[in-house]
């Protein structure tokens, strides 16, 4: 595959997974709310979040190694093998420590206020939630501690699209298993057990595929270098600390938000944010497949292709996805009522804050990719700490006055600060390696961001004028997109024109 083909295949797989996720949310949320109580569904959401937080060091380890693999490149299989096999023992140790930490927190009663802030939950449901969390944590050790690292190794050889398509298949089976289980009367605890079993069975051919790819590319087992493995683990743990704030900003808000506003309001907040999270994954479909190619351009100091890849991200995430978010804002009141069976209150202002926050987040993705791809630890820690403090402090202060809308406002403010810091640090690093941040394209992207944000808030305030606002913002963004397209390098423009010709015109 060429770089363009790998990017398109990886993006297609990621979009397919988003479609599966979207269908899953549309289908499973009504099923869950029809068969489970709101507190039981709220516990389901809390379990997902606590699981993400409890595995933060493992994820930091995997992500750090993933970028190290990309920096080494496909031409040094022995060096890749040494790094991979030296990291396996420490990956297992990290996962086991996280599992023990979850068990200790549960038996110490530290998670009681997270699941049951009002002290009125059914005791059986609380115990079932804790058991489900323990099972999930243990399964992480068995299924992902090593295979996730292997998946990052093969991405170096251009196998990211294939792994992404496997992820689509797994998502389909997981979604189907959850929906069918609940429809047949399974409780929260039983549903989790079924999901773990199904996920493990579906992952077996993935393990076989990874083994075949390793053998094909001469990634033979070697004796671990314990000092190298320890060094990588310590560096990744430092990175994981910054990831805690990032995860809290994106998903973990619900953990402490339930203590501030109650489980019901937290459930409303999380459910409204669900479709926003789907769009967040959409941004990942652009940046994740781009990462191996971006790292190659940085290694080769290819300014033209670097600018082209950044421009392509902004064109898709801001102009095209931004238009979709404007359209979604106009239909969400109807969709949300049908989706939740009227059991959860919809707040258009909160959804607008989420959508604009997503657009700001997408603006910073190229800068974040440059910083993360080069494992600039100090920069990531400082940025994440500053933004995390703003996010958490803002939520605590604003929710007392504005409720869950205040939490949404705090998240938006955090994204603004994050974008400013990331762009500043990325352009500073590019200068150090004699590359240039594309300021002219960045300013055009900001114009598109501003217009789309105004359109989204306008629909929230003037819902009866939503069609007119959508048409005007779409026309403006198409004009901006056409102007934006002029700055593409010639070879990149030729490829993109073939993809987006109907939208951009001749």
Spans of features found by a protein language model:
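Alpha-helical transmembrane segments of multi-pass membrane transport and lipid-handling proteins
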Residues: 86-117, 176-180, 307-361, 392-401, ...
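Membrane-interface junctions at transmembrane-helix termini in multi-pass inner-membrane proteins
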Residues: 4, 8, 140-165, 184, ...
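Hydrophobic alpha-helical transmembrane segments
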Residues: 164-214, 385-392, 404-426, 472-477
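Helix-loop junctions and terminal segments of transmembrane helices
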Residues: 59-74, 155-156, 215-218, 272, ...
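Interhelical loop/hinge segments that connect adjacent transmembrane helices in multipass membrane
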Residues: 1-7, 119-124, 188-194, 206-250, ...
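Interfacial/gating helices of multi-pass transporter permease domains
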Residues: 29-53, 188-193, 228-239, 255-277, ...
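Transmembrane helical elements of multi-pass membrane transporters/channels
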Residues: 9-26, 170, 194-210, 226-296, ...
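Membrane-proximal transmembrane or re-entrant/amphipathic helices at the cytosolic face
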Residues: 453-506
